[in-house]
Amino acid sequence: MSDINATRLPIIWAPVVPCISDDNDSTLTRGQR
């Protein structure tokens, strides 16, 4: 099970991390959206 979680975590966090970093640059996220 740990192997499955290890493979899923990067897939889940891959799109999440950029969104969090984009929130720090609110001007960029607003420009994109």
Curated annotation (Swiss-Prot):
Keyword Methyltransferase: no
Pro-piece positions: 1-10, 19-33
Organs and tissues of expression: Expressed in basidiocarps.
Keywords carried by this UniProt record: Toxin
Post-translational modification: Processed by the macrocyclase-peptidase enzyme POPB to yield a toxic cyclic octapeptide. POPB first removes 10 residues from the N-terminus. Conformational trapping of the remaining peptide forces the enzyme to release this intermediate rather than proceed to macrocyclization. The enzyme rebinds the remaining peptide in a different conformation and catalyzes macrocyclization of the N-terminal 8 residues.
UniProt cross-references to InterPro entries, sorted A to Z: Amanitin/phalloidin (IPR027582)
Annotated GO MF terms: toxin activity
Crosslink (Cyclopeptide (Ile-Pro)) position: 11-18
Purpose: Probable toxin that belongs to the MSDIN-like toxin family responsible for a large number of food poisoning cases and deaths.
Family, per entry: Belongs to the MSDIN fungal toxin family.
Protein name (database record): MSDIN-like toxin proprotein 2
Organism: Amanita exitialis
